[in-house]
Amino acid sequence: MSNRKLFTPWSLKGVTLKNRIVMSPMCMYSSHEKDGKVQPFHMTHYISRAVGQVGLIMVEATAVTPQGRISDQDLGIWDDAHIDGLAALTSQIKTYGSKTAIQLAHAGRKAEVEGTIYGPSAIPFDENSRTPVEMTKEDIKETVQAFKKGAERAKAAGFDIIEIHGAHGYLINEFLSPLSNKREDEYGGSPENRYRLLREVIDAVKEVWAGPLFVRVSASDYKTKGLDVADYVGFAKWMKEQGVDLIDVSSGAVVPADINVFPGYQVGFADTIRAQAEIQTGAVGLITSGLQAEEILQNGRADLIFVARELLRDPYWPKTAAKQLNTKIEGPVQYDRAW
């Protein structure tokens, strides 16, 4: 076993990851029949990273309603007909030693599908975007129940971990940010009110899900009068009280913004939330080397490393990272002669 922290196990609620590497959820827009079902591409895409020894494979943003899709070719979990394909996917991933997670999502005003799109307020993302319909309280209630049903289906499909997508300008993020939420009822105004939708979604999911629960957040709006990491420390404390186990810390995309991007540019947000809210965090964003990942973990800045585009470039990134750290990890027996 490697003595590098990146390759130490991580355990929670009966789920043990063999290492701290997470395949970050990345939309593939590959449900080409527009029915939200798993396709052969998804099987190849995710299973190849399991063969590559990723500890946790997180399936991309999966829509809890048809109108909550980012595109009409997104994966879906709004119908029982989606369960079989997702179950086949989780089963195959686990065959190769990885654990499985799914990100439950609703795109809100950033949905690019036919028909009505919804948001907390009738404010478009930008001048080139459609204007959403402001959600009624009944719309909100139905959406909360859609997340609950999505969690039930995720459980039926055999996922080990659920993540609620509260980042990147999608519906939950839109409710959290005062830049996109101008409501005057109990879902707008104060931080407590803007958090209410996420609170209700977490409570609903936990009614049917006892396993590890993550929430992805955008810890900065990168705009004056928008949210910053201090606001998310407060939200994270509330999430912890509700039983959320880990905050997956990203940033941006609730409104157009100029973002100074550099290697590990979001790690400081994960560090701050971890320290000040006393909750486990995942670091994500331009983490490309084993040395970089190991530094984050060794210095207690995050608990898990979410790797995105680097895993698109290199499905066997765990082996690459191990080599960079001058250590060895066990690989597939079929690859012994080259591993």
UniProtKB/Swiss-Prot annotation:
Q: Which residues form a coiled coil?
A: none
Q: Where does FMN bind?
A: 24-27, 61, 103, 216, 308-309
Q: Name one GO molecular function term.
A: FMN binding
For the ligand (substrate), the binding residues are 29, 165-168
Source organism superkingdom: Bacteria
Q: Which NCBIfam families match?
A: PRK13523.1
Instruction: Write down what this protein is called.
Output: NADPH dehydrogenase
Which organism does this record belong to? Bacillus licheniformis (strain ATCC 14580 / DSM 13 / JCM 2505 / CCUG 7422 / NBRC 12200 / NCIMB 9375 / NCTC 10341 / NRRL NRS-1264 / Gibson 46)
Q: What is the lineage of its organism?
A: Bacteria, Bacillati, Bacillota, Bacilli, Bacillales
UniProt lists the gene as namA
